[in-house]
Amino acid sequence: MPIVRFIRSLLLFLFFIVYTAPYATACFIAFPFMNAERRYWMAVGWCRSTLFVARHLAGIRYRIEGQENLPDGPAVLLSKHQSAWETVAFPAIMPRPLCYVFKRELLYVPFFGWALGMLKMVHIDRKEGKYAFASVVKQGRLRMKEGAWVIMFPEGTRTRVGQQGKYKTGGARFAIDAGAPVVPIAHNAGHVWPRNSFIKYAGTVTVSIGKPIDSTGLTPDQLNARVEAWIEAEMRRIDPHAYRDAGGGASASSGKAGKRGGGDRADTSLG
C-alpha cells in the first residue's frame, strides 16, 4: 500500500540521517590509526548496514549471478548505472576493495566527502585539463597493484529503467592503458531505488556479472562496444518487461517501471 511504502521510505531516510554522521565521525577518529585496507573495510561496514536496514525496512533484497566470473587479479568493472543502490551495494558484495573514480569536488561534501578523502580512491581534477586522464590512469594502476578493482559507470549518469544511455569510452581507455581486463555488470536496481524519488520499492535486485573481456589488442571503441553489447543484452534478459523492444537500442520503459528512476547529472565516467 502507498502509505506503508511511504512510512518505510521515511524510516530508511531517517536511518541515513541518524546513522551516517556518527559513523563518519567514528571513521575520522579511527582512520589515522589504520592502514588503507582496514579503513576501506570499516567504511564498507556502513554499506553493509545500509543493505541490512534496506532489506528489513523497505523489503529491498538482491541476488548475484555470475560471481564466479570475477577474476583473481586486477580488473576494471564497468557497470550499468540506474540508481544510488549500486554505489552503496557494490563495495558490500564484492570480495575485493573497489576504487571508485569520482570528481574531486565530491571531497568537499560534508561527512561523505570527508570520509571519501581518507580512502584510497581515484579522483578526477578537471582543472588539470588534458593531463586529467593520465592522472587517473596513474592512480588507478597504483590502486590495482595494491589489490583493488577500479569501477566506473560508462553511461556517466543514472538512466531511467528501460533506457540506454550513451556509453563513453573513458573506462575502456583506462582498462587498455592499465593493461587490465574489463568485467561488465548489469543490474535492475532502478526498480527498487529509483533516482529522483523519495519512495523506495520492495523487490529483489538482480546483479549479473559477465565474464572478463580481455582488453589486449583492442581499441577503446572496440572494447567499449563489447562492454555495451553485453550489458544491454543482459539488461534485456534480466529485466525484459522494462524494454518494449528486446533486441533494439535505447527505449523507454512502460507502465510503473517507466515512472521510476529519472536521470541525473552526476558524471561518473571518463570522457
Regions found by a protein language model. Give the residues of each.
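Non-catalytic C-terminal accessory region of glycerolipid acyltransferases
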Residues: 3-6, 133-271
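Generic preference for hydrophobic
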Residues: 64, 77, 100, 207-209
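Catalytic core of membrane glycerolipid acyltransferases/transacylases, capturing the structured
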Residues: 24-45, 55-57, 72-129
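Glycine-rich helix-loop-beta junction characteristic of Rossmann-like nucleotide cofactor-binding loops
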Residues: 66-70
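N-terminal membrane-anchoring alpha-helices
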Residues: 1-63
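Thr-Gly-centered strand-to-loop micro-motif
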Residues: 65, 101-103, 124-126, 154, ...
